[in-house]
A protein has these predicted regions:
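Final/C-terminal transmembrane alpha-helix of multipass membrane proteins
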Residues: 225, 231-247
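Short, membrane-interfacial amphipathic segments enriched in basic
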Residues: 3-36
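Membrane-interface alpha-helices at helix entry/exit sites of multi-pass transporters
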Residues: 41, 129-152, 227
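Selective transmembrane-helix segments that form parts of the transport pathway or gating/packing helices
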Residues: 46, 50, 54, 94, ...
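Short cytoplasmic-facing helical segments at TM-TM junctions of multi-pass membrane proteins
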Residues: 115-139, 222-225
């Protein structure tokens, strides 16, 4: 029996994940079914995440500026190089990755808990018994919201990160805002923004698809929902980091 083979549980779980994605892809054309839920998810995934993204961006940029200045405390480099390093690091890597890891906890936990609770309380079964396509109604809008909102949140994190760097540099007397921006512009390339957008789209899909899968197939009552939520968050973070490495190896 395949179920008795080593690693069979992982193979079966991947099969369920692939099946859910296939059903979601097929159901994505049923816009009238998930239209209302989609706009609600835009608000929950996007608008309600702005405060935490603001804090993450500001302090990431500020700390990175202070640490970069500490490492480059020498006359061998112009002070503008600090702005270059901070801006490049934020745009290419930190704005997308750190935001994704934070959102895996905030957004991912919410989605997996919602779907898991609906599964164990038989609300999903009730939807299907009434003729609703549960995947189209519940899963598709959440994945689409991730795909569309994560790039916007990435830009938000990048902007606030650079502003945080400028502020920290000026307040701490490291370098004036004009010199920071001069350095940032000197090594700015449009391809960096494109790379960041690609990352954010991939991360949005990875996180929302994994947490939807874990929540949708949750079982075992309240304890099972908690387990599914924990697994969803951990797996999302792991696959965000793996996909980050893969994208860097392929695109850079």
């Amino acid at each position: 029996m395949i179920s008795n083979l080593p690693g069979s549980a992982g193979i079966q779980e991947f099969g369920h994940y692939a099946k859910l994605l296939y059903q979601a892809l097929r159901s994505s054309t049923e816009f009238s079914t998930y239209r209302k839920n989609l706009f609600q998810e835009f608000i929950k995934v996007g608008y309600e995440s702005i405060p935490i993204i603001f804090l993450v961006g500001i302090f990431t940029g500020a700390v990175l500026t202070l640490q970069t200045a500490y490492q480059l405390d020498t006359d061998l480099y112009p002070s503008t190089i600090i702005g270059s390093i901070v801006a490049q690091s934020i745009i290419i890597e930190l704005a997308a990755v750190i935001s994704a890891l934070v959102l895996a906890g905030k957004v991912g936990a919410r989605i997996s808990t919602e779907l898991g609770t609906m599964r164990v309380s038989e609300q999903i079964d009730a939807l299907e018994s009434m003729g609703f396509n549960s995947v189209s109604f519940l899963v598709v809008p959440r994945i689409l919201a991730g795909l569309l909102m994560f790039p916007i949140l990435y830009v938000t994190a990048a902007v606030f990160g650079i502003l945080g760097g400028i502020t920290a540099g000026a307040v701490d007397g490291i370098l004036p805002a004009a010199e920071f921006l001069e350095g940032a512009r000197a090594f700015f390339f449009e391809s960096d923004i494109i790379f960041g957008f690609i990352k954010s789209i991939v991360f949005g899909f990875v996180i929302t698809s994994i947490v939807c899968f874990k929540g949708y197939y949750a079982f075992g009552g309240a304890e099972g929902v908690g387990t599914a939520t924990t697994q969803a968050t951990v797996l999302s973070c792991i696959f965000v980091l793996l996909s980050d490495f893969a994208l860097a190896a392929i695109l850079l």
